[in-house]
From Swiss-Prot:
Transmembrane segments: none annotated. This is Arginine--tRNA ligase. Its EC number is 6.1.1.19. The lineage of its organism: Bacteria, Pseudomonadati, Thermodesulfobacteriota, Desulfovibrionia, Desulfovibrionales. A motif ('HIGH' region) lies at residues 125-135. InterPro entries: aa-tRNA-synth_I_CS, Arg-tRNA-ligase, Arg-tRNA-synth_N, Arg-tRNA-synth_N_sf, ArgRS_core, DALR_anticod-bd, Rossmann-like_a/b/a_fold, tRNAsynth_Ia_anticodon-bd. GO terms for molecular function: arginine-tRNA ligase activity; ATP binding.
Length: 551
C-alpha cells in the first residue's frame, strides 16, 4: 500500500527527530470503520512512556508534524486514548492509476526478498501412483508461492524430491511383479498391503508386451526391473500431469542419489562429530531431544536399513550446501508430527529457525452431486489430478485449491466450478477482468481514445466514493503481495482478488462508464477500469490462472 509506506516513512522520520526508535509494536492498519480514515496508527500510545508525554498530547504533536510533512494528507484526527486516524486526499488516491500504468505487469512487485535465494519443495509424492487432488492442492500452493516470492524479489528454485528409495518403492516393484505373474498365468500370492490400482496391472501388461520373458527372470531381478520401469512410468505421468496443471519444477532430486553418493553417511558423521548421534541396541539414533523434539529418533535401524528421516536430513543438508537462504517444504497435514524433528535436524545443521519453514496442506474433500468421493492410492480408489483438470480445467482447479488457507479443509465442488455464474469464485474473478476488457473494446468501437499515459488532471473526474474505494483497493496490492511473500501465505492473493472483483462488479452495476455526462469523465473512468484490470491480471498470473479478455 503506497499510502501505508508513505505514512510509515513520515512517522518514522518524525519519531527519529524526537530521538526515539521505531518500536516493533507500532501498527499502521486500515480502520474497521472507513469513516475513521484511511489508516490508523497507534504510535503515540506505544512511545508515550519513552517520550515522557501523555498519549493524546503526543498524538497531537505527531498530527501537527504529519500535516506539515506530507501535503498528500487531507486530515489527521485523534481518537480514543491517542490513536491517529489519517485520511489521504482524493488527488493522492487518483495518482494510483498513474503508478499502475507506469508499472504495468510488474505492478504489485516489491523488493522484500532483496535477491535472497529461496527453495520451495512441493508435491514430492511417492512415485507409486498417479497424483490425486490432495497433491494438486500442494502443487497449486507451491507453484503460486514460488511466483509470489519471485514477484517479491527472491531468487527462487522449485524442486520435487523423488522418494525412490525405501520400503514403498520395493512394494511397488513387488506389486507390478505379482501382476505380471498373474497376467502370465503363473502362481502368485497377493499380500494385503500391495498396490491394487488398475494402473499397476497396466504397467505389468506394458512390460510383458515389451518383454514376455520378464516372468522367467529370478524373482529378485524381476522385481528390480519392475520397480525401475514402474517408477519411471509413473514419474513420466506425474511430470505430464503437473505440466498440464501449469506447475513447473526446475529440479527433480532423487532420494536414491543421496544413498548412492554417500551423502547420508556423510551427514551421520557430521552429527556424530557434533555429539548429536549415538549408537544404541545396534541402531544409530539422533539426539533430537536436545533440540526441542519430544524424543530421540532412529536414523539407521538395527538391521541396517535407513529411516526416511535419515535421508531427509541428508537432503536438507544438501539444500543448504547449495546456498539457499530460505528453505520451504510443503507437506500434507498428516505429516504435522514430523515438523519438530525436521526443525531439530535443521538446527543441528547449524541453520537459524528463520531459514526453514514448513507449510502444511489440509485435506481436500472432492464433491460430486453432493457426494464425497473416496480416495486411497493403495486401494486404487481415488480421483486423480489428471481427471479433475480434464473435467474442470486448470484455471478452475488452481483457483479453487488457492481459495482457502492451506491449513483449512477444502470442499472442492466439481459442479460449482463448472458453472458460469457469480456463485463460482473462479468465474467471479475472471469475469472482472473480462468485463474491463469488454468496456475498453466498446470504447474503442465508439472511437473513444484512452491515452496510453495520462496526467493527474485527467483523473480529476474520479470523485465518487465507489471510485475512491476502488483506488484504495488497487493501492493495497503491493502490501498484500508483500504479506503473502513474508508470511508464505499465497491465499492472500485469491482473497484480495475476490475483494477487488466484488468492488469492480458493484461499481459497474451502479456507475455508467461509457454513458457519463462528459467525455472527460468517460476517459477518467476508463483509466480507472484499465488500472483495476491490470491489478486483477497481475494477481491471476501469480495464481497461475489466465486472465481472459472475453467470457
Amino acid at each position: 500500500m503506497r499510502a501505508r509506506q508513505q505514512l510509515l516513512a513520515s512517522l518514522q522520520a518524525i519519531v527519529k527527530d524526537m530521538g526515539l526508535s521505531w518500536p516493533e509494536k507500532a501498527t499502521l492498519e486500515p480502520p474497521r470503520d472507513k469513516s475513521f480514515g484511511d489508516l490508523a496508527a497507534n504510535i503515540a500510545l506505544v512511545i508515550s512512556k519513552d517520550a515522557g508525554v501523555p498519549p493524546r498530547e503526543l498524538a497531537s504533536r505527531l498530527a501537527g508534524a504529519l500535516r506539515d510533512s506530507d501535503p498528500a494528507i487531507a486530515s489527521v484526527d485523534i481518537a480514543g486514548p491517542g490513536f491517529l486516524n489519517v485520511t489521504y486526499s482524493p488527488d493522492f488516491w487518483r495518482e494510483t492509476v498513474l503508478h499502475v500504468e507506469a508499472a504495468g505487469d510488474r505492478y504489485g512487485a516489491t523488493a522484500v526478498g532483496a535477491g535472497r535465494k529461496a527453495q520451495v519443495e512441493y508435491v514430492s509424492a511417492n512415485p507409486t501412483g498417479p497424483l490425486h487432488i490432495g497433491h494438486g492442492r500442494g502443487a497449486a500452493l507451491g507453484d503460486c508461492l514460488a511466483r509470489v516470492l519471485r514477484f517479491a524479489g527472491y531468487d527462487v528454485t522449485t524442486e520435487y524430491y523423488i522418494n525412490d528409495a525405501g520400503r514403498q518403492m520395493r512394494l511397488l516393484g513387488l506389486s507390478v511383479w505379482l501382476r505380471a505373474l498373474e497376467l502370465s498365468g503363473r502362481p502368485f500370492t497377493l499380500p494385503e498391503d500391495f498396490y491394487r490400482g488398475d494402473y499397476i496391472k497396466d504397467i505389468a501388461a506394458e512390460m510383458l508386451a515389451k518383454d514376455p520373458g520378464l516372468v522367467d527372470l529370478p524373482e529378485a531381478e524381476g522385481q528390480d526391473r519392475c520397480f525401475e520401469y514402474a517408477m519411471n512410468s509413473i514419474m513420466d505421468g506425474i511430470k505430464q500431469d503437473l505440466a498440464d496443471f501449469r506447475v513447473e519444477h526446475q529440479v527433480w532430486f532423487s532420494e536414491l542419489s543421496l544413498v548412492r553418493e554417500g551423502a547420508v553417511e556423510k551427514t551421520f558423521e557430521r552429527l556424530k562429530a557434533a555429539g548429536l548421534a549415538f549408537e544404541q541396541d545396534g541402531a544409530l539414533w539422533f539426539r533430537t531431544t536436545t533440540l526441542g523434539d519430544d524424543k530421540d529418533r532412529v536414523l539407521r535401524k538395527s538391521d541396517g536399513t535407513l529411516t526416511y528421516f535419515a535421508s531427509d536430513i541428508a537432503y536438507h543438508d544438501n539444500k543448504y550446501d547449495r546456498g539457499f537462504d530460505l528453505v520451504v517444504d510443503i507437506w500434507g497435514a498428516d505429516h504435522h508430527g514430523y515438523v519438530p524433528r525436521m526443525r531439530a535436524a535443521v538446527a543441528a545443521l547449524g541453520k537459524r529457525p528463520e531459514q526453514f519453514d514448513v507449510i502444511l496442506v489440509q485435506l481436500v474433500n472432492l464433491l460430486q452431486n453432493g457426494e464425497q468421493i473416496a480416495m486411497s492410492t493403495r486401494a486404487g480408489q481415488f480421483e486423480t489430478l489428471h481427471d479433475v483438470v480434464r473435467e474442470v480445467g486448470a484455471d478452475a482447479a488452481r483457483f479453487m485449491f488457492l481459495s482457502r488457507k492451506s491449513d483449512s479443509h477444502l470442499d472442492f465442488d466439481l459442479e460449482l466450478v463448472k458453472q458460469r455464474s457469480m456463485d463460482n469464485p473462479v468465474y467471479y474473478v475472471q469475469y472482472a477482468h473480462a468485463r474491463v476488457c469488454a468496456v475498453l473494446r466498446k470504447a474503442a468501437e465508439r472511437a473513444i481514445v484512452l491515452p496510453a499515459r495520462l496526467d493527474a488532471a485527467a483523473l480529476a473526474p474520479l470523485t465518487l466514493p465507489e471510485e475512491l474505494d476502488l483506488l484504495r483497493l488497487v493501492d493495497r496490492m503491493p502490501d498484500t503481495l508483500s504479506a503473502a511473500a513474508e508470511g508464505l501465505a499465497p491465499h492472500h492473493v485469491s482473497f484480495y482478488l475476490m475483494e477487488v472483483a466484488g468492488a469492480l462488479h458493484s461499481y459497474y452495476a451502479k456507475v455508467p462508464v461509457l454513458n457519463a455526462a462528459d467525455a472527460e469523465t468517460i476517459v477518467a473512468r476508463l483509466a480507472l477500469l484499465r488500472a483495476v484490470g491490470q491489478a486483477v491480471a497481475n494477481g491471476l498470473n501469480l495464481l497461475g490462472v489466465e486472465a481472459p479478455e472475453a467470457m
